[in-house]
């Protein structure tokens, strides 16, 4: 939903070049989401198996290990993103305006790769722990936060794609704080 919300605000308040940039960086965002989902799904299954076997201490160790894996994965993804971002955009024959918009959005988004991975994982861990209502609350809070902040940052403060990126990562990370 974050991409749809950003797209609506960006297309109506910034313009088509900014929307093009948003669409060009979306595969990177989808990759972050896919890796996060992979870690969360496998991790929650491993943790719940240990809990079902009556091994809560091992489940806690797995949880701690998975948090470390998420942090390291997020740091690597952020580093690789910054390392290759210029080369990827440079190879696309983009207009200078679209290229700048891509950089504006993705450079801010990548800074929050670690908390995004952790939040996505915590959401699935909550479901696995029988706290589906809390997981839903976190997801709804994140979506509402994104909508409100997109409006404030883009329409009110005129922050452009930087504002859209910040609104998105705030929305995605809010679940970790709820």
Feature roles, as predicted:
Residues 1, 106, 110, 133-140, ...:
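Hydrophobic faces of transmembrane alpha-helices in multi-pass small-molecule transporters and flippases
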Residues 1, 5, 35, 71-83, ...:
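Generic alpha-helical transmembrane segments of integral inner-membrane proteins
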Residues 57, 70, 125-151, 162, ...:
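Alpha-helical transmembrane segments of multi-pass membrane transporters/permeases
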Residues 4, 13-16, 50-53, 128-133, ...:
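Helix-loop interface residues and adjacent transmembrane-helix termini in multi-pass membrane transporters
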């Amino acid at each position: 939903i974050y991409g749809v919300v950003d797209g609506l605000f960006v297309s109506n308040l910034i313009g088509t070049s900014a929307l093009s940039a948003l669409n060009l960086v979306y595969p990177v965002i989808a990759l972050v989401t896919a890796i996060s989902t992979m870690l969360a799904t496998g991790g929650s299954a491993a943790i719940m198996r240990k809990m079902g076997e009556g091994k809560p201490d091992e489940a806690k160790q797995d949880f701690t290990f998975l948090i470390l894996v998420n942090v390291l994965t997020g740091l690597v993804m952020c580093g690789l993103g910054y390392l290759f971002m210029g080369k990827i955009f440079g190879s696309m024959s983009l207009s200078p305006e679209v290229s700048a918009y891509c950089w504006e959005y993705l450079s801010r988004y990548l800074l929050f790769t670690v908390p995004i991975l952790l939040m996505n994982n915590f959401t699935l861990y909550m479901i696995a722990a029988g706290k589906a209502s809390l997981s839903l609350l976190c997801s709804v809070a994140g979506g509402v936060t994104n909508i409100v902040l997109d409006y404030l940052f883009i329409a009110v403060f005129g922050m452009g794609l930087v504002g859209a990126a910040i609104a998105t990562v705030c929305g995605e990370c809010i679940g970790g704080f709820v």
